[in-house]
């Protein structure tokens, strides 16, 4: 996802959501507020809410929709059967009283929800099991790193949630504060390495992006 794509699109339906939208917008330089034509004066106007959300979703843009979660889900439902990566999508109450991550757990939606929650002084409604238990999403490493195999990573997290301990090999400072069940003799391992190889069984392999690009 490029820097431009990382900036969320803030979508509102009416004037009542504009103040909250502007507060969120101030947190993300370059973000635009999209408002329904004829109802609210925003940075950009649209005429069909569902079409707008689907266009943003297909363009891999993070979406912050100030409306009921059900409206967002129904609008994006035709696209959700497709396999592949999805951008962060969250619903936000018009008055800023609730922040609900909906889609994009592996694309940083919970991080986005926490950032917006800080702006609005509310706790986001995070439901991701791994993140609630460990305090982080191990399948969403920070910028500059990439998973070697997402599908194996999902199985790895299932084993962690099942109670298996883990050891960490390599420089993974972002995991220092994570509540992982660490054991230096564990069979499961999170391994951060520039070595371009296939992950071994019981291993979550993470590569630095810059080194991976050089090897390619």
Predicted regions, residues:
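SAM-dependent methyltransferases
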Residues: 1-63, 68, 75-88, 92-216
């Amino acid at each position: 996802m490029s820097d431009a794509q990382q900036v969320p699109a803030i979508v509102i339906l009416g004037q009542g959501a504009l103040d909250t939208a502007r507060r969120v917008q101030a947190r993300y330089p370059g973000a635009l507020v999209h408002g329904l034509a004829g109802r609210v004066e925003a940075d950009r106007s649209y005429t069909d809410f569902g079409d707008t959300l689907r266009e943003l979703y297909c363009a891999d843009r993070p979406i912050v929709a100030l409306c009921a979660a059900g409206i967002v889900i129904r609008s994006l439902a035709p696209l959700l059967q497709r396999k592949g990566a999805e951008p962060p999508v969250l619903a936000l109450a018009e008055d800023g009283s609730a922040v609900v991550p909906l889609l994009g757990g592996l694309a940083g939606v919970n991080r986005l929800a926490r950032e917006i929650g800080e702006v609005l002084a509310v706790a986001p409604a995070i439901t991701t099991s791994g993140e609630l238990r460990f305090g982080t999403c191990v399948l969403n490493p920070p910028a500059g790193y990439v998973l070697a195999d997402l599908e194996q990573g999902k199985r790895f997290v299932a084993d962690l949630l099942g109670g298996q301990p883990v050891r960490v090999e390599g420089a993974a400072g972002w995991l220092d504060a994570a509540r992982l069940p660490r054991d230096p003799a564990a069979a499961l391992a999170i391994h951060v390495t520039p070595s371009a190889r296939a992950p071994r069984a019981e291993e979550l392999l993470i590569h630095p992006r810059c080194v991976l690009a050089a090897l390619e």
